């Protein structure tokens, strides 16, 4: 290898030129890098929905869900298919494997659409859809709420729509959605008795409305002066027009307003709602286009919303619900502050251990390496976020190693009397090759996360390129720039040659080494014993795949029984609202989503499908302590004040999302069997002392009334089952009869009975059914009976499936999930054929990610072994070097247990990085031993002299790495990795 240090010193002007270029380029690149809180990762999921009004959940499953699911099984790269089927509605989730290439995802979704269209012709008449959503991973980082105490829902919607249109013009905005909009209808409600006494069939009213509102061309007349279009009046312009509509029956003509109440009001049952601090609101959710600058977008939105607030009517307010740009700015600021602290710590180590001038050389190298890293990050499109900044901090503890080793060797040679030029060039010949090998080995330690699949690896994908770039640049700087700085800065007092290793400390260290070598059998056995004790203690380390974040948001989900109305859910949400108002001193703001879940305002939040029996609160606390206090208050209230719903509290995750810490999926061929086994698993989970809020995600039946029609009587009255079904649907739920056009909106005109008539179950049998000879009560042609039916059926890969879910004591995480799963072993061994119990959620994600992470490990080992062979040239020495790496587990286990840290995904990455660092130091030491042996020393003397020679640089680099990790130890995400490395 050509002496790059000599080249640098002979062409100093060129080197100084590139130093300036990279320094300036680094500043510009840092200012231009995109900012994010978390790195993006692809959610490989498509959501398919379909509706069949009037169908039971069982009919929906058999006639719609099953047919679609079976066809979707042909999807290439399929991981799993899950579905939620309710009465009249199905939602199917198609998930792809994590190893499906990003470029194949869109073509795969096209295949799914084609599969669905193939099945469409086999679906029953009346099925609406299927519809496809392959943008399930859109993140709405900025959410606003429009409120106004004295304004109607329609006025709030109109104001929010105006805000939406204004925001769409902002650069980098991709999509703006309204949330919690209450649609309006024109309701034509007629009393049951009036309908029966007049003998007017609802179909007559429907037909009259439909024929009146039809928009048809009136024709046009060509004249010498141009074309004149004919516009024929007749469509409804106002409610009075509808009231004046003539209805003919039995030779008589009535005005519709005389026999029915006609009103314009919000849809009933209501649409999913949004509330801000307990007040009705319409939300505005904003997503950013790919590649946009979120901080620039935040500034643009801040300016625009300030102007929009001034334009709103008096008494109407625009509130900021979620401000991702501000969160990102705060997160980046905290990480940059941590990086600055780490730099100060590393510099302090350098100055204290090497002296002012030598330490200054190292200090000058650090910003140069960081600047070069920023330039490369900008070129590769790597943004500043939690992972890339964490990688920089990790790299910081490593990148100073090469500079310290180079300048330390240069200082030693200067102390031995060499000139500055010769000392610098000698440092290259002695250390450059082993340093490069060690650097490449350290980079190779991150190969598993770089080339493995899975959301976790995708989340941490920036680790390998950022650390690799930083370490390679640090080697280049250490052999070309550090010697140049050292040439100008390092001075040795006096001109007399002296041995820097003839101090009392080194003499003591020599005696210790001599003793260890003389008693090497005892040392080796003791080391092996400690190593195996560490392995035995390893299972006692806590297991948590990804920890919760320190964001102030608290997510609270309320789930009522299947079949519960939106009004019941609203009542339960109002109780929680009252509790939050009592603790307003701990809250910045809170938002309630009734009948729906929050939009995905953070990538790690997993939205749920709309359901009338579900509500979700997003509570922004004033700090993490207040967040913890609120969670405790709400959990206590779940047993006393919120007994009508299942209450679940959750913090935002720092990695891929999971709904609950404990999730076990039970699948079986029948719904009865899956319920039976799920109840047993639930009992096992409840017996674990660490669990709380153990429940099944569906099991209870929904209430229903069965209407058994008498076919003979139907025939006698000239009716069909279809006639009766349509009539009941019209009278009870309301059928759309026509449309009303107002401004840019189209409102449906719905015909139904009055509220008193359609909600009284006791009078259901008296509902009038029109016949050719007049109306008859329903119970004259049918028998009514109460029954319980499946309100919800969930399936996983075509089988009925129930999820056993539970919260756990803080800090338990995957430990509790694994413990509960192991406790089901006896039950699993005795399950009937086709019935399974498998882990899901975080535990399954951890297993999948670790399996993916392990796959590239053989390649990593091969690369490390190859590098070692090129360096040491001996199988024995290569094996010796590799054997030093596992000894790092001794310190890892001790540190993790003492700090009570959890062994999760990032901690395993830290262990791999630690192995690379240990091997790196071993390479440099063995290379030094080989040089001493080549100079004629006996192996024993070569070992001792090399260890003495390498002690200071190894100790300094270790101290820099350990102390550089200190700021990260207090970070909830990177803390376990920092503990493992340090």
Named regions from a protein language model:
Residues 1-35, 431, 497-546, 587:
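Signature of alpha-helical transmembrane segments and their immediate interfacial
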Residues 5, 23, 59-135, 193-214, ...:
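Solvent-exposed, membrane-proximal periplasmic/extracellular interface segments of envelope transport
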Residues 7, 16, 49, 166-344, ...:
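Extracytoplasmic/periplasmic membrane-proximal domains and adjacent transmembrane bundles
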Residues 13, 21-55, 117-126, 378, ...:
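Transmembrane helices with small-residue packing motifs
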Residues 26-32, 317, 344-411, 864-950, ...:
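Hydrophobic transmembrane alpha-helices and their membrane-interface caps
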Residues 35-46, 83-89, 126-149, 177-183, ...:
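Flexible hinge/switch segments at interdomain interfaces of large molecular machines
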Residues 321, 328, 332, 407, ...:
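Helix-loop junctions and hydrophobic alpha-helical segments within the transmembrane domains
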Residues 396-410, 431-451, 458-497, 617, ...:
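Transmembrane alpha-helices and their membrane-interface boundaries in multi-pass membrane transporters
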């Amino acid at each position: 290898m050509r002496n790059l240090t000599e080249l640098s010193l002979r062409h100093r002007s060129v080197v100084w030129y590139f130093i300036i270029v990279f320094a300036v380029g680094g500043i510009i690149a840092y200012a231009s890098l995109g900012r994010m809180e978390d790195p993006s990762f692809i959610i490989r999921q498509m959501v398919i929905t379909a509706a069949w009004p009037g169908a039971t959940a069982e009919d929906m499953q058999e006639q719609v869900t099953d047919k679609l699911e079976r066809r979707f099984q042909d999807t290439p790269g399929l991981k799993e298919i899950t579905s939620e089927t309710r009465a009249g509605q199905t939602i199917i989730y198609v998930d792809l494997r994590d190893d499906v290439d990003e470029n194949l995802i869109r073509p795969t979704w096209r295949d799914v659409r084609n599969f669905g269209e193939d099945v469409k012709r086999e679906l029953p008449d009346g099925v609406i859809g299927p519809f496809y959503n392959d943008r399930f991973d859109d993140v709405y980082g900025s959410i606003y709420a429009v409120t106004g105490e004295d304004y109607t829902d329609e006025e709030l919607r109109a104001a929010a729509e105006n805000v939406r249109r204004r925001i769409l013009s902002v650069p980098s905005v991709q999509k703006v959605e309204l949330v919690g909009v209450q649609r309006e209808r024109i309701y034509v409600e007629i009393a049951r008795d009036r309908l029966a006494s007049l003998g007017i069939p609802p179909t007559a009213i429907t037909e009259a409305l439909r024929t009146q509102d039809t928009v048809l061309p009136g024709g046009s007349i060509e004249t010498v002066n141009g074309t004149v279009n004919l516009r024929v009046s007749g469509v409804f312009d106002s409610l009075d027009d509808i009231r004046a509509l003539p209805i003919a029956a039995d030779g008589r003509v009535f005005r519709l307003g005389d026999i029915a109440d006609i009103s314009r009001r919000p849809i009933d049952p209501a649409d999913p709602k949004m509330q801000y601090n307990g007040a009705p609101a319409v939300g505005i959710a904003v997503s950013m286009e790919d590649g946009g600058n979120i901080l620039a977008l935040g500034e643009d939105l801040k300016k625009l919303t300030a102007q929009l607030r001034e334009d709103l009517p008096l008494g109407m307010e625009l509130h900021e619900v979620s401000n991702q740009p501000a969160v990102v700015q705060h997160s980046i600021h905290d990480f940059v502050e941590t990086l600055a602290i780490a730099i100060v710590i590393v510099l302090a180590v350098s100055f204290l251990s090497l002296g002012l001038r030598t330490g200054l050389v190292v200090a000058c190298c650090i910003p140069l390496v960081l600047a070069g890293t920023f330039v490369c990050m900008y070129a590769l499109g790597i943004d500043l976020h939690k992972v890339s900044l964490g990688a920089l901090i990790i790299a910081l503890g490593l990148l100073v190693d090469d500079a310290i080793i180079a300048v330390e060797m240069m200082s030693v040679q200067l102390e031995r009397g060499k000139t500055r030029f010769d000392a610098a060039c000698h440092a290259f010949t002695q250390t450059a090759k082993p340093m490069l090998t060690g650097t490449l080995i350290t980079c190779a330690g991150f190969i598993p996360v770089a080339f493995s699949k899975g959301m976790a690896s995708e989340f941490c994908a920036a680790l390998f390129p950022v650390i690799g770039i930083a370490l390679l640049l640090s080697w280049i700087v250490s052999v070309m720039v550090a010697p140049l700085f050292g040439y100008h800065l390092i001075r040795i007092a006096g001109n007399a040659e002296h041995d820097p290793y003839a101090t009392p400390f080194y003499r003591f260290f020599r005696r210790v080494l001599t003793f260890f070598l003389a008693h090497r059998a005892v040392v080796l056995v003791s080391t092996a014993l400690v190593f195996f004790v560490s392995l035995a203690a390893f299972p006692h380390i806590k297991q948590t795949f990804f920890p919760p974040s320190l964001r102030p948001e608290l997510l609270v989900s309320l789930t009522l029984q299947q079949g519960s109305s939106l009004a019941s859910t609203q009542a339960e949400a109002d109780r929680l609202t009252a509790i939050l108002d009592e603790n307003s001193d701990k809250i910045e703001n809170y938002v309630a989503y009734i009948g729906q879940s929050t939009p995905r305002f953070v990538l790690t939040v997993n939205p749920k499908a709309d359901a009338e029996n579900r509500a979700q609160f997003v509570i922004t606390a004033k700090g993490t302590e207040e967040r913890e206090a609120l969670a405790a208050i709400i959990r206590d209230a779940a047993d006393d004040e919120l007994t009508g719903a299942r209450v679940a509290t959750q913090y935002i995750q720092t990695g891929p999302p999971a709904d609950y810490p404990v999730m076990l999926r039970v699948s079986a061929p029948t719904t009865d069997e899956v319920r039976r086994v799920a109840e047993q698993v639930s009992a096992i989970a409840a017996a674990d002392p660490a669990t709380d809020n153990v429940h099944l995600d569906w099991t209870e039946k929904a209430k229903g009334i069965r209407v058994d029609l008498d076919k003979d009587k139907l025939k006698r009255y000239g009716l069909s089952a279809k006639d009766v079904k349509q009539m009941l649907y019209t009278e009870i739920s309301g059928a759309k009869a026509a449309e009303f056009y107002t401004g840019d909106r189209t409102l449906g005109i719905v015909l139904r009975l009055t509220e008193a008539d359609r909600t009284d179950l006791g009078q259901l049998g008296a509902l009038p059914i029109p016949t050719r000879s007049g109306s008859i009560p329903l119970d004259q042609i049918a028998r009514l009976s109460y029954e319980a039916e499946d309100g919800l059926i969930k399936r996983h890969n075509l089988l009925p499936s129930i999820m056993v879910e539970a919260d756990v004591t803080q800090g338990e995480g995957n430990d509790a999930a694994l413990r509960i799963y192991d406790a089901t072993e006896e039950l699993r061994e005795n399950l009937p054929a086709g019935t399974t119990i498998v882990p899901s959620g975080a535990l399954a994600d951890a297993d999948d990610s670790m399996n993916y992470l392990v796959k590239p490990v053989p390649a990593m080992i091969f690369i490390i072994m190859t590098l070692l062979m090129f360096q040491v040239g001996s199988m024995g020495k290569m094996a010796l070097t590799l054997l030093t790496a596992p000894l790092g587990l001794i310190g890892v286990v001790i540190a993790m247990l003492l700090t009570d840290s959890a062994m999760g995904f990032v901690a395993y990455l830290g262990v791999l990085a630690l192995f690379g660092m240990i091997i790196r130091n071993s390479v440099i030491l063995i290379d030094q031993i080989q040089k001493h042996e080549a100079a004629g020393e006996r192996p024993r003397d070569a070992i001792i002299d090399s260890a003495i020679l390498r002690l200071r640089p190894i100790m300094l680099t270790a101290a820099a790495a350990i102390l550089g990790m200190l700021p990260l130890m207090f970070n909830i995400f990177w803390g376990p990795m920092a503990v493992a490395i340090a």
